[in-house]
């Protein structure tokens, strides 16, 4: 791995322990990143074990290609395609564990050229896969106040969404201004239009940058599809281990596990026969333990782990 952009895997041992690795099992790491979790899984697999890792970031793929272990296969694509990849491998119902480490990796944040961070000047891009889709700069050039407001409010949960959106459009429409193409430009603009009484500990641009990244990469849709796909491909007693980094992600994971643990909800008093009730299906998962958060020691070593939450579930 490049010394320039090191990555420390969050909740590494807890998430791998949650998979209850079998030496001859078949596992999916839906988010290879820089390979911390994948390497840990591989270290616990025997000769007949298999690990298939997924990532859509070309830099992650380059890192994955340095692994020569014959038990390992890298798949270039979004983790929302998890079920499709497993179908092509003819392994549906045979997967012993799926790991999803959501959010942006440290190398992506630290590399100014990727445009994810307001702390470093770089092109205003934010795409997980720079070869597809459009950069944030292009979207901001075309979107109206209502659309920008919705994105910031929906994905950034920022109460100043309208004010920020209005400021972006006003800046854009002033012909004397340079086009918004740099992260530093956008961060400075947001700081200027945010209320002076805005006294959060976080930088005023934190929530907006998160919102634009989530939107431009369709992250929540990707997560929803990946969770459903994982459920479909897991073997009985197979484990799902998911690390999230903000409340929107964790809420999705929590609600998904809760919903699949309850099974179909039939309104009280609805006249259904036993056969009809059976046809509706039953609970498909069960939660394993409670949500796990990083220890103080881990946060001290890696401050970016402070908001992470690990949830584990088992296929029934």
Curated annotation (Swiss-Prot):
GO molecular function terms listed in the Swiss-Prot or TrEMBL record: rRNA (cytosine-N4-)-methyltransferase activity
Pfam families associated with the record: Methyltransf_5
SUPFAM superfamilies associated with the record: Putative methyltransferase TM0872, insert domain, S-adenosyl-L-methionine-dependent methyltransferases
Disulfide bridge partners, by residue number: none
Methyltransferase listed as a keyword: yes
Gene3D superfamilies given in the database record: Putative methyltransferase TM0872, insert domain (1.10.150.170), Vaccinia Virus protein VP39 (3.40.50.150)
Residues reported to bind S-adenosyl-L-methionine: 35-37, 55, 79, 101, 108
TM region positions: none
Sorted UniProt keywords: Cytoplasm, Methyltransferase, rRNA processing, S-adenosyl-L-methionine, Transferase
EC annotation from Swiss-Prot or TrEMBL: 2.1.1.199
Enzyme class: transferase
Domain of life the protein comes from: Bacteria
Reactions mediated catalytically: cytidine(1402) in 16S rRNA + S-adenosyl-L-methionine = N(4)-methylcytidine(1402) in 16S rRNA + S-adenosyl-L-homocysteine + H(+)
Main location: cytoplasm
Entry's Gene Ontology cellular component terms: cytoplasm
A biological process term (GO) from this entry: rRNA base methylation
Record's subcellular location: Cytoplasm
Family assignment from sequence similarity: Belongs to the methyltransferase superfamily. RsmH family.
Functional summary from the UniProt entry: Specifically methylates the N4 position of cytidine in position 1402 (C1402) of 16S rRNA.
Name by which UniProt lists this protein: Ribosomal RNA small subunit methyltransferase H
Organism placement in taxonomy: Bacteria, Pseudomonadati, Pseudomonadota, Gammaproteobacteria, Vibrionales
């Amino acid at each position: 791995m490049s010394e320039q952009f090191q990555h420390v895997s969050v909740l590494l041992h807890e998430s791998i322990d949650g998979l209850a690795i079998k030496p001859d099992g078949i596992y999916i790491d839906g988010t290879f990143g820089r390979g911390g979790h994948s390497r840990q899984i591989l270290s616990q697999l025997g000769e007949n074990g298999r690990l298939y890792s997924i990532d859509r970031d070309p830099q992650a793929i380059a890192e994955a290609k340095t692994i020569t272990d014959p038990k390992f296969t890298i798949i270039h694509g979004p983790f929302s395609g998890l079920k499709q990849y497993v179908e092509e491998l003819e392994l549906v119902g045979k997967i012993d564990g799926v790991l999803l480490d959501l959010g942006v990796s440290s190398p992506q944040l630290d590399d100014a050229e990727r445009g994810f961070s307001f702390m470093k000047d770089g092109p205003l891009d934010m795409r997980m896969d720079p070869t597809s889709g459009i950069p944030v700069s292009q979207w901001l050039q075309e979107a109206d106040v209502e659309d920008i407001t919705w994105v910031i409010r929906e994905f950034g949960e920022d109460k100043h969404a309208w004010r920020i959106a209005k400021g972006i459009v006003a800046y854009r429409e002033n012909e004397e201004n340079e086009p918004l193409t740099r992260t530093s430009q956008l961060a400075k603009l947001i700081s200027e239009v945010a209320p002076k009484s805005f006294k959060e500990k976080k930088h005023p641009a934190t929530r907006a940058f998160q919102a634009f990244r989530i939107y431009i990469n369709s992250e929540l849709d990707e997560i929803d599809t990946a969770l459903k796909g994982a459920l479909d491909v897991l073997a009985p007693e197979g484990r799902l281990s998911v690390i999230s980094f903000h409340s929107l992600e964790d809420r999705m994971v929590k609600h998904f596990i809760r919903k699949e643990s309850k099974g179909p909800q039939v309104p009280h008093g609805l006249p259904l026969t036993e056969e009809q009730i059976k046809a509706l299906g039953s609970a498909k998962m069960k939660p394993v333990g409670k949500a796990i958060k990083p220890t103080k020691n881990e946060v001290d070593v890696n401050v970016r782990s402070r908001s992470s939450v690990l949830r584990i579930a088992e296929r029934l």
